[in-house]
A protein has these predicted regions:
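Bacterial Sec-dependent N-terminal signal peptides
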Residues: 1-27
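Generic hydrophobic alpha-helical membrane-segment signal
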Residues: 6, 11, 36-39, 54, ...
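Residue-level recognition of conserved structural "scaffold" positions that shape functional pockets
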Residues: 10, 57-58, 130, 183
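N-terminal, post-signal peptide beta-strand-biased segments of exported outer-membrane/organellar beta-barrel
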Residues: 21-128
Length: 271
């Protein structure tokens, strides 16, 4: 059995690593929509096999995509797993090309045996990421003073802390469940300025959303053995849907903060 001191030490390491996971390491204009770019909900072992996860069952790997897989671990094993990803992306609009390189600390998980028929896992991983910065200049040749510069940028994302357990109910059948806590803040900003007209104040619109909610995943795995060396595992996961609890606002700022001429208008909270 795993000692409580060792478990506590690993849990503290997970919390310290949460600061690295919470950092935004995304640079994509597509994250403007929805909750941003959804993170790949899979471990390194799952990604190496093309994203397959529900049927994976390995006593040396944490498969948090299906909590029924936790029972594969033996009583002498304690698993502490982390993931890092690197991304190299090229963007093009037909005339302009841009390259973006990003790195991120994907997940921190641990898994251990509770008893002969039960095992537990907990971990911290990202759920979505928002990160972009774009600019557009609209030139008015007839009235240069009305030429405008638009800027769009956003950041934030959602994070997921889960606790799960798996149980072996029959020799070849295991079931399990993960309960996850979601939290995060997402901010989108749109700014318009008029470089050729100093008398026209710039306008900045900030849309922010703060989310705190939960997620439940229920999984099952059935393993059929063929001979002495081969077996096949069928996995299934059910996640009940529900609305995320969120607190949103829209704020308009009229003026130039450098000169101190700023007017803030905060609208009613959106639910």
């Amino acid at each position: 059995m795993i000692g409580y001191r060792q478990t506590l030490l690993v849990f503290l390491l997970m919390m310290l690593s949460g600061a690295a996971i919470a950092q935004n390491n995304t640079n994509s204009p597509y994250t403007r929509y929805g909750y941003g770019q959804l993170a790949d909900q899979g471990s390194g072992n799952s990604k190496a096999m093309g994203g397959i996860a529900y049927g994976l069952r390995d006593k040396y790997q944490v498969n948090f995509a299906n909590p029924a897989s936790y029972t594969a671990i033996d009583s002498l094993t304690f698993i502490f797993d982390g993931g890092i990803s690197l991304q190299n992306t090229n963007f093009s609009n037909g005339t302009i090309k841009q390259n973006a390189k990003n790195s991120s600390f994907d997940y921190i998980t641990m898994q251990f045996r509770l008893g002969k028929w039960a095992a537990m896992s907990l971990g911290l991983l990202p759920y979505s990421n928002v990160g972009y910065s774009m600019a557009e200049y609209k030139e008015d040749t007839d009235y240069p003073s009305q030429s405008s510069a638009l800027q769009y940028y956003g950041d934030g994302g959602l994070h997921q802390l889960y606790l799960g357990a798996g149980f072996k109910v029959l020799k070849n059948l295991s079931v399990g469940a993960n309960i996850s806590y979601f939290w995060g803040d997402i901010t989108h900003t749109r700014a318009i300025t008029f470089p050729g007209n100093s008398s026209t104040l710039p306008l900045t619109t900030i849309t922010g959303t703060s989310i705190q909610s939960y997620k439940l995943d229920i999984g099952a795995q059935y393993t059929q053995v063929f001979g002495k060396k081969h077996e096949a595992t069928l996995g299934i996961v059910f996640s009940p849907g529900h609305d995320l609890n969120n607190d949103s606002y829209v704020e308009d700022r009229l003026g130039n903060e450098k000169t101190g001429t700023t007017v803030c208008i905060e609208l009613d909270h959106l639910r």
